Amino acid sequence: MMKRMVILRRCEPPPPQPAAAVVAAMGGCCGRVRYGECRRNHAARMGGHAVDGCREFLAEGEEGTGGALRCAACGCHRSFHRRVVVVQQCCACDTAAAAAAAGGWEWRDCSPESSSSASSTTAS
């Protein structure tokens, strides 16, 4: 007797990427992804746990090539390395999109000259 296998697909959109969700939640802050130490378990077949000493992902090739996803230090794929999102604070006055995302708030000039002139006008 043959068994039948039914494959179900979800109609929902895929969940957002974690890095994009963090950047969106921070209100327009800039985020950069860095890959840390390698977490590949080389002794998984034997039931043990052994990792190599690779401390940071170094791409073998340029961005857009196959070598960009392979580590030059340990030879592992980039997905074996720990993903770290480095959040950087961006000046909201640099982009019009950030002002629109803030709900119409007006942003002051962030340059040091304008802040010093604004403080001198309020002091007099």
UniProtKB/Swiss-Prot annotation:
Highest taxon, organism lineage: Eukaryota
Organism: Oryza sativa subsp. japonica
Keyword annotations of the record: Cytoplasm, Metal-binding, Zinc, Zinc-finger
Main location (coarse class): cytoplasm
Protein name from the UniProt record: Mini zinc finger protein 4
rRNA-binding listed as a keyword: no
UniProt-annotated location(s): Cytoplasm
Stated role: Inhibits zinc finger homeodomain (ZHD) transcription factors, by interacting with them to prevent both their nuclear localization and their DNA-binding properties.
ZnF (ZF-HD dimerization-type) ranges: 35-84
Recorded GO MF terms: DNA-binding transcription factor activity; transcription cis-regulatory region binding; zinc ion binding
Coiled coil, from the record: none
Xref: InterPro entries: ZF_HD_homeobox_Cys/His_dimer
Any one of the GO CC terms: nucleus
An annotated GO BP: regulation of DNA-templated transcription
NCBIfam families: ZF_HD_prot_N
Binding partners and assembly: Homo- and heterodimers.
